[in-house]
Amino acid sequence: MLFRSIWSQIEYQIPYATTSPQLFEALSEIGVSAISNAIDLIANGSTPTAQSGEVSIAAKVKKEECRIDWNASAEEILRKIRAFAFNPGVFSFIRGEQIKISEAQLAEGILAPGEISATGLVGTKDGAIQLINLTPAGKKAMPAKDWLNGFKPQQGERFE
């Protein structure tokens, strides 16, 4: 039976700051090699290896899971941004407007969780992140610095 059979397998170490779109691209390239290898094995009459362990299925991501909790650690927030950078995207609200954040990095700074500075630093439970790219509601993706030029955060203003 071919169910739960493995024809080809390649291990891949995911680099630290990889976003989901970057991972999809890398895996699509690696997949070509795996598929080619599997076709050769099938053509040569080889039998597949049985899968060990249980099958794991990822649950569907709910929209509310993509909302940033600024009381989380900077690392947790960055992981969420990288994981959902492309789809469905992580978001937060400020001044009642939804902002999707597609790229950020760890930064030094001491701000309250969710507090945003004029330079795009945002406070977290244990530090800060620097906004790099984002998408305001109804607009195209843009560098955070361009958004900040028009938005002009007030002292102590916070993402919700």
Residue ranges of predicted features:
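Polar low-complexity intrinsically disordered regions
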Residues: M1-L2, W147
